[in-house]
Regions:
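N-terminal intrinsically disordered, cationic/polar leader segments
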Residues: 1-196
Length: 196
């Protein structure tokens, strides 16, 4: 069964189309209008072995907030749709990723209960054209749209570029683990409830 989802969303502020393949090879075709954001999404795709197409037209003449937040909403919806009924998958995933002086932790639970715990400290307002405060907004939107429990924590380091990049890559690795099949589940959902 292919685990591919395409989700579109159009508002007065943004026009977004995302296609996500959970069982890809790490290919990305990205155009958000924010170069550093594209770079982060490319890292996510490559390190999680997801194929990701993300086309965004946003009101960047205002600022990047709507573009980044709305991309997170659509991205989360694509994850939820691609994951499907969650039968046979690990459900949980975690990764601790080093990037030079930075160490980032990410843990994911595809529980159907949205929650974000984001503990990263930034020292500059922007990296490239991406407002650093929007990194949390992106992950918040992803977690709530995907209905996932998501923890991202900076364990060490101070370079904002490295912190953000490590967070995106750790998220990719954790989500890859959470979406992998475990044959011991025999197609069942990993929950005492029988469903998620």
């Amino acid at each position: 069964m292919e685990r591919i989802a395409t989700v579109t969303r159009t508002t007065k502020e943004t026009d977004i189309a995302i296609t996500l393949n959970l069982d890809g090879t790490g290919k990305a075709d990205l155009s958000t209008g924010i170069g550093f954001f594209d770079h982060m999404l490319d890292g996510f795709a490559r390190h999680g072995f997801f194929d990701l197409e993300c086309k965004v037209k946003g009101d960047l003449q205002v600022d990047g907030h709507h573009t980044v937040e709305d991309t997170g909403i659509v991205f989360g919806e694509a994850i939820k749709k691609a994951v499907g009924d969650k039968k046979g998958i690990n459900r949980y995933g975690y990764f601790i990723l080093p990037m030079d002086e930075v160490l980032a932790l990410c843990a994911v639970d595809l529980s159907g209960r949205p929650y974000l715990n984001f503990e990263c400290e930034f020292t500059v307002p922007k990296v490239g054209e991406l407002d650093t405060e929007l990194v949390k907004e992106f992950f918040y939107a992803v977690s709530y749209s995907a209905m996932m429990n998501l923890h991202i924590k900076q364990l060490a380091g101070s370079n904002d570029h490295h912190i953000i990049e490590a967070a995106f890559k750790a998220f990719a690795k954790a989500l890859d683990e959470a979406t992998q099949y475990d044959s011991r589940l025999s197609g069942q959902v990993l929950s005492t409830k029988g469903s998620l």
